[in-house]
UniProtKB/Swiss-Prot annotation:
Ca(2+) 5 binds at residues 362, 364, 366, 388. Ca(2+) increases protease activity. This is Serralysin. It is found in: Secreted. Keywords: Calcium, Hydrolase, Metal-binding, Metalloprotease, Protease, Repeat, Secreted, Virulence, Zinc, Zymogen. The Gly-rich repeats may be important in the extracellular secretion of this metalloprotease. Residues 1-16 form a propeptide. It comes from Proteus mirabilis.
Amino acid sequence: MGSFLLKKAVGLSNISDLLDKSGIFYNYSTKVLPSFDYDTAGKHIAREDSTWNGKYVIGQPAEVTYSFPKWEGKFNQFGNKNPYEFNELQKEHARKSLDAWSDIANIKFTEVAVGNVDGMKASDVKTDITFGNIYDPNGTFQAYATLPNTYAYGKDLSGQAWFSDYHYAGNTTPELGNYGRLTIIHEIGHTLGLMHPGDYNAGQNVPGYLKSDYAEDSRQYTVMSYWDEYETGAHFQGAYAGAPLLHDISAMQYLYGANTTTRTGDDVYGFNSNTGIDYYTATDSNDKLIFSVWDSGGNDTFDFSGFYQDQLIDLRAGNFSDVGGLQKNVSIAQNVTIENAIGGFGNDIIHGNDADNTLIGGEGDDIIYGHSGNNTIYGGRGQDTLHGGTGSNTFIYKEIADSLVTAADKIMDFKTGIDKIDLSTLIQDTFSSKILNFVDNFTGNAGEATLSYNEVTNASELAINAYGYNYNPDFKIDIVGFVNYETDFIV
């Protein structure tokens, strides 16, 4: 994948030398790469400052037209043989990819119907972006596209995106998660003004990741990279992104401004998604989610409840989550707040952020960190370790299995008079008496609870005999900190 990038007008005979080639040559070094932050990486990917508003006109909204011409003739303008029209599946995924870019930035796309066009006259098409296929056994490129403001030989060659089916048949069968969809999103990125993170194009003795301009040049961070996500410690298990990633969002918003109308309501990402967007939606435990969230408001949720693997779910902007058995495959763009997270069947680690979070562990032995904010934390079944954080936090228990005597939860930082332990659902749904009665010792009656505190270890223990079958508790929570039975419980 790639683009040819013209600094000045050149003859058409030279343009073919600037197109993508299939060979990539690696020349690794021991160079220590600098790290680029979110803004720096975004500006670097957009370093040509080329938009559909003009060269060096950045940060302004744009209206961009596109088309799928019915190509005719033996060549396109770059000397590639047998141009022909996108098929319907390609058109579908091109539209989805365009939507993905406009989702994050102030770009309005309008499709224009275009009829038969000689490939040698592609620059005469009156739309900003044109898509086409090439069947050229002599060509060596997989796909290429031109930036806005690309001129050569007296022609405006801006916004042309060409895809070879001879050297990569997957270009004509794009699906979410495959390389064909990644290729489309990548090439559209070029047509909107994005560069590769380094000054490389396939076929130009590409030096390899270790000679990148900066450490985050990989497909963990940007769809514009040539380098696989594992170069930076991620692992997508053979899947590819189908939408802009973390640094792509930064880059495109630098060029066109942020789309602040995108998803201002209460949105769910993952299982039970209400976004209507394929790359934000999981419906099966085998789905592979790869996305970076841009969201403009509301009370929003990461729902990864349908996955069985151990997961790391991190709601802090700029950080990465390990979701559904993949590593570092989900992130949150800067200036975006996701308030809630739901874990799955594995042993999950969940980090909240500065907002008032609702954090749900689900099944498994989970570790939850509320950080700041006034959080609601529900570990769910399993032996969970719960850190409320600095705010006023509520720890919820709904059933006996949430904290068994043999696998008790541990609340690590309880603050008496500030935090609460909510047993109301547990009492109403489990106790025949519907009442929690604190006692010094169990007497065999249902609904009895004991609460002890060790001043030396600063540890409390809540034990409950829910059913009254004997003198032993069914439910227990270990708590770091003093707990007042009169004020610290919701019953």
